[in-house]
């Protein structure tokens, strides 16, 4: 697994940790399978998850990175009452993790042969 990646010219790390690690306690005080720390530029992932679930979790956490790197988090804070900020952020990350593949697969179907040029460019633009 790649342990470093760049988004918006910032280097981020992915670190696997034991399932009871202090790094897996989230902002709401819950123990979870992964967290993202924008100050450390780090995603912490439980070493016990794998396969499709790991992929979903990584997409979710990388979406947090995108929200912070492109200052989308500031828009969430501007548009949401304080008590809804974290739930809205989580919902956005879940939407991409749960439905992102379907969106891009559908775009490929709609664009046909043109998708090979359009969809990868748009994906790169979103995370570069």
Name what the model sees in each region.
Residues 1-53, 72-128:
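Metalloprotease/metallohydrolase-associated module, dominated by Zn2+-dependent proteases
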Residues 56-68:
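Active-site recognition of the HExxH zinc-binding catalytic motif
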